[in-house]
Structures are given as C-alpha cells and as structure tokens.
Amino acid sequence: MDFPPKVVASVTSKDDAKEAIALGADVVEVRVDLVGGDGPGLVESIYYDIGCPIIVTIRPKFEGGEFDGTDAERVQLFKKLTPYADFADFELRAKNLDELLTTITGTDAVPIVSYHDFDRTPSNEEMLSIINRSVEKGAIGKLAVMPKDMTDVLRLLEITLKSKRPVCTISMGSLGQHSRLVAPVYGSLLTYGYVRRPVAPGQIRVDQLLEGLRILGLR
C-alpha cells in the first residue's frame, strides 16, 4: 500500500466537509461518534452530495471518543456505513476487532487499525509492535501518542521511518504539533487537520497543513 501522503479533515457536519474539500483536503473523516444526531445520514449525504473520499470513524469512549453504545451496535453501524467509505477506522484495542474488520467485506473500504495513547509515548519496541499488529490485520497502522518532551517526538519519527510499513503516525499536543507536518516526510501516509475546530490535540487547520506539505515538496 503506497500513495502520496493525504490530508484528512476531521468533520462533524456537511458544511465542514464542503469547506474541507474547498480548502484542498484529500479525504474527510466523519467522526460519527461526535455528530450527536444522524451520523449515518451525514455519511450518506457527504457521499452522494459531495462525492469525496470518506473515512468512517465511530470512536468509543475507551479510545478517547464519544460512542457509548454496545459492541453489537457499533458493528451494525459500521455495516451500514462501510459501503460509503473509502477507509474505516477500527481500534487495535477493540475486543471485537476481528468482527469489526468483517464489516468491510464486500466493500472497497481500506481498514485503518488505530491505537491512541493520550498519556505517553511508548517505548520504541512497543510502538513497533503496535504498528506491526495493526498492519498484520491488512490495514494501515495508525499510531497517535502523547509526548513528554521533544525526544519522544523524535522517537516517533524514527519509528515511522524504520517501520517500512503502511502507517499514519502522530505525536499529539503542542509539543508534537509539527509532527503533523513532518511525519509524512518519514513515511506517514495520512495527516489529520481540522476545518472549524480541532477534534484531537495539536491538529492544524487543513489549508495550513497543505501549505506546509507544499513547502516540504510533498504536494
């Protein structure tokens, strides 16, 4: 799996999705867990009316999201939405990960298997293990971690370069904010930005991300 780094805009409304594409985003991530209303309707509306590539994310509370339904309810939601998705994001720590992965069967959706640590940056060995376990599921491995110092950010970039796997890596918060621009230099396939307000710590506005990638020769 190899393609130029894509700029992803995390959105919770159709207007956000329209603005994201106008700003130059390659993909919109619909945070169904943050929509607070008709999430499935929003995904379908973006699919039919805007026609841009979509990542469907239904992030549960145990991974920093807002979805608090049952595992079975989340599986059914994914089954309903993956036909409209280009990517579907599932958590490595989900107890029913294998069942979640079956929801893309028969669709064109590419799985993203993600791992978020909002407290620390694991050891290099742990991060490589997380990436490998994610990629072994046939997925892009997404690893988002919180740095305590700049050395943590550098370690994440080192792992990104060394992994030689299809990955998306993010060092979160203000300390790691620049990783959203430079991680693609080291091999990260996706970088996430926002349109109106950040949905994750350290996100950069989509148009600013694009300008940074142009300066770095990645656009």
Curated annotation (Swiss-Prot):
Involved in the third step of the chorismate pathway, which leads to the biosynthesis of aromatic amino acids. Catalyzes the cis-dehydration of 3-dehydroquinate (DHQ) and introduces the first double bond of the aromatic ring to yield 3-dehydroshikimate. Its EC number is 4.2.1.10. Belongs to the type-I 3-dehydroquinase family. Homodimer. This is 3-dehydroquinate dehydratase. The active site is at H116, K142. 3-dehydroquinate binds at S10, E29, V30, R31, R59, R180, Q203. One of its GO terms (biological process) is 3,4-dihydroxybenzoate biosynthetic process. PANTHER family: 3-DEHYDROQUINATE DEHYDRATASE. It catalyses: 3-dehydroquinate = 3-dehydroshikimate + H2O. One of its GO terms (molecular function) is 3-dehydroquinate dehydratase activity. Keywords: Amino-acid biosynthesis, Aromatic amino acid biosynthesis, Lyase, Schiff base. It comes from Methanocella arvoryzae (strain DSM 22066 / NBRC 105507 / MRE50). InterPro entries: Aldolase_TIM, DHquinase_I, Type-I_3-dehydroquinase. Pathway: Metabolic intermediate biosynthesis; chorismate biosynthesis; chorismate from D-erythrose 4-phosphate and phosphoenolpyruvate: step 3/7.
